[in-house]
């Protein structure tokens, strides 16, 4: 038998062996022998890892986790989900949409209040950017945001949308967020904060999309521009000014709309940062912002983010930290 034929036969035998083992594991789970099946999955995981069969280990743990989730065995399922991450961390697996979708699927099935879920998402985001201090791949953030939106966890969904490139999805979530939790006089506040924070994250494209989509879809906003709400007019002018990059326009705009900007003490802090990023305004002389506002702004900016270049999220796929 030639070498290629021998390799093909070996591969077929291996697949057949894996399928038989998985069949036994599934039967154990369906009989209710959860502990036995869980331990067997772990044994196979370490066996595959010792043989550097990373893809096989990852797929087996993923399918096993789904099986345990389908039988409401949260602890076993969460453990196998963590092993999926362990494979990714220890192998040279590239970040691909299919893997990100698998991670998001596991996240969606975990108990919403479990500590394992928080640990899982933290490790998954860290892996998705190569283990650096950056806060995760935009695609993974988008998938997490969509799951949290379905769970009506709007604040967490908003956080992940801000680190994605999905301005349209973010806007639609914000409309629902306002309808569920907001007051009528806050219709403009929901989108203004999102636009300003997207701009602070150097994501001009998503800032524009979230504004246009929100103002088009929101049932309480009359068609514009111009808008009835002064703050919405300010945001519209600001996005135009960012495209133009003229400091005088930005300065006059901020002065003219001060009454609207005083509605939230963070707005001027965000605008200081936007002035630096898009209009060449030098940073303040003080080494850092102080007090509560400083803590909030620093959490938005990240502690050591490089300011060089004004890039959109599609070009800069490592958004800065936002707590």
Swiss-Prot record:
Biological process, per Gene Ontology: protein insertion into ER membrane; tail-anchored membrane protein insertion into ER membrane
Q: Which UniProt keywords apply?
A: Cytoplasm, Transport
Q: Does the keyword Cytoplasm apply?
A: yes
Q: Where is the composition biased (Acidic residues)?
A: 304-315
GO CC, alphabetical: BAT3 complex; cytosol
Q: Tell where it localizes.
A: Cytoplasm, Cytosol
Which stretches of sequence are listed as region Disordered?
303-323
Quaternary arrangement and interactors, per the entry?
Component of the bag6/bat3 complex.
* Protein purpose: As part of a cytosolic protein quality control complex, the bag6/bat3 complex, maintains misfolded and hydrophobic patches-containing proteins in a soluble state and participates in their proper delivery to the endoplasmic reticulum or alternatively can promote their sorting to the proteasome where they undergo degradation. The bag6/bat3 complex is involved in the post-translational delivery of tail-anchored/type II transmembrane proteins to the endoplasmic reticulum membrane.
Membership in a protein family: Belongs to the GET4 family.
Name of the protein in question: Golgi to ER traffic protein 4 homolog
UniProt lists the gene as get4
């Amino acid at each position: 038998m030639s070498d290629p034929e021998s390799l093909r036969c070996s591969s077929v035998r291996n697949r057949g062996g894996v399928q038989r083992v998985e069949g036994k594991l599934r039967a154990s789970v369906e009989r209710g022998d959860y502990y036995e099946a869980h331990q067997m999955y772990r044994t196979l995981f370490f066996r595959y890892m010792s043989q550097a069969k990373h893809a096989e280990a990852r797929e087996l743990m993923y399918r096993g986790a789904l099986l345990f989730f389908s039988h409401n065995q949260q602890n076993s399922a969460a453990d196998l989900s963590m092993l999926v991450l362990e494979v990714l961390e220890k192998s040279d697996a590239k970040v691909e949409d299919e893997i990100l979708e698998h991670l998001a699927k596991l996240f969606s099935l975990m108990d919403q209040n479990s500590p394992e879920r928080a640990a899982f998402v933290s490790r998954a985001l860290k892996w998705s950017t190569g283990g650096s201090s950056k806060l995760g791949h935009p695609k993974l953030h988008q998938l997490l945001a969509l799951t949290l939106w379905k769970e009506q966890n709007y604040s967490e969904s908003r956080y992940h949308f801000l680190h994605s490139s999905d301005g349209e999805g973010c806007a639609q979530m914000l409309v629902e967020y306002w309808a569920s939790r907001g007051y009528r006089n806050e219709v403009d506040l929901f989108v203004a904060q999102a636009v300003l924070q997207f701009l602070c994250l150097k994501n001009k494209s998503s800032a524009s999309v979230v504004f246009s989509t929100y103002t088009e879809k929101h049932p309480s906003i009359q068609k514009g521009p111009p808008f009835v709400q002064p703050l919405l007019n300010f945001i519209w002018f600001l996005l135009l000014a960012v495209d133009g990059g003229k400091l005088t326009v930005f300065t006059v705009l901020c002065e003219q709309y001060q009454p609207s900007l005083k509605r939230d003490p963070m707005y001027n802090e965000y605008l200081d940062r936007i002035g630096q990023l898009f209009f060449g305004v030098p940073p303040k002389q003080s080494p850092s912002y102080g007090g509560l506002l400083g803590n909030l702004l620093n959490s938005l900016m990240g502690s050591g983010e490089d300011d060089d270049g004004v890039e959109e999220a599609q070009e800069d796929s490592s958004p800065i930290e936002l707590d």
